[in-house]
Amino acid sequence: MLSVICPIYNEEKYIAKCIDSILAQDYPKDDLEVIFVDGMSTDRTREIVAEYTAKYPFIRLIDNPERIVPPAMNKGILASKGDIIMRLDAHSTYASNYFSVLVKALYDLGADNVGAVCKT
């Protein structure tokens, strides 16, 4: 399973586009979980993510009262079920093959870590 972790805080302007690009991924949804770790947003970020979590069971929202990225990643990793961890940024959108290309590269190269350049 691929566990995608996305730390978020006050992302209401960007989060829907980010999630829509996640939903457009060609990666199998039955082998995917997406965990948004929210730093207690004060805008509509949580409401927007909640609309998606209600429709898509592989998307979750957890809290990060510490409000900074390192604890958000740690909380996301602890909550994850996958054997592969991927980090995303909420300000970005992702090509529909982004997940599958990175996972394939990880296995093909026998690498411990792979990354990509994204346009934000």
Question: Predicted segments — roles?
Answer:
Residues M1-S21:
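N-proximal low-complexity "stem/linker" segments adjacent to membrane-targeting elements
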Residues Y14-A16, D43-E51, N97:
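Acidic helix N-cap motif at the loop->helix transition within catalytic regions
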Residues S21-D31:
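Short, acidic, metal-binding catalytic loop of nucleotide-sugar glycosyltransferases
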Residues D31-M40, R60-P65:
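Short beta-strand/loop segment that forms part of the nucleotide-sugar
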Residues D38-E47, S92:
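A conserved acidic beta->alpha catalytic loop
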Residues N64-S80, V101:
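Glycine-rich, basic loop-to-helix element that forms the pyrophosphate-binding segment
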Residues I85:
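Short aromatic/hydrophobic "clamp" motif used to bind/position activated sugar donors
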Residues N97-T120:
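Conserved donor NDP-sugar-binding/catalytic core segment of glycosyltransferases
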